[in-house]
Amino acid sequence: ATYYKVKLLTPEGEKEFECPDDVYILDNAEEIGIDLPYSCRAGSCSSCAGKVVSGKVDNSDNSFLNDDNMDAGYVLTCHAYANSDVVIETHKEEEV
């Protein structure tokens, strides 16, 4: 796997870690002890929503976000793979 730097901008401050391109960002964050919101873990709700500030993610597995949300940079971290070094604002459920 290729590893990318993921920086999460959370209400508790910045969290940065290396994430392989074949592990969902939410799963990887949890493994290293970063507590992020989630509910279904299936890409079909908005509990884990975040917004990409820079970089690229593959969020094509999600079934909740519409094209407008995705065009605006919103992702579901439970079903998002890093495709580059990426910065994501977390806790965006209210916005989607």
UniProtKB/Swiss-Prot annotation:
UniProt cofactor(s): [2Fe-2S] cluster
Domain 2Fe-2S ferredoxin-type: 4-94
Protein residues bound to [2Fe-2S] cluster: 40, 45, 48, 78
Keywords: 2Fe-2S, Chloroplast, Electron transport, Iron, Iron-sulfur, Metal-binding, Plastid, Transport
Pfam short name (any one): Fer2
Free-text comment on the cofactor: Binds 1 [2Fe-2S] cluster.
Record InterPro entries: 2Fe-2S_ferredoxin-like_sf, 2Fe-2S_ferredoxin-type, 2Fe2S_fd_BS, Beta-grasp_dom_sf, Fd_pln
Primary subcellular site in the record, as a coarse category: plastid
A single Gene Ontology CC term: chloroplast stroma
Entry-linked Gene3D superfamilies: 3.10.20.30
Single Gene Ontology MF annotation: electron transfer activity
RNA-binding keyword on record: no
Family designation: Belongs to the 2Fe2S plant-type ferredoxin family.
Name of the protein this chain belongs to: Ferredoxin
Species in which this protein is naturally found: Panax ginseng (Korean ginseng)
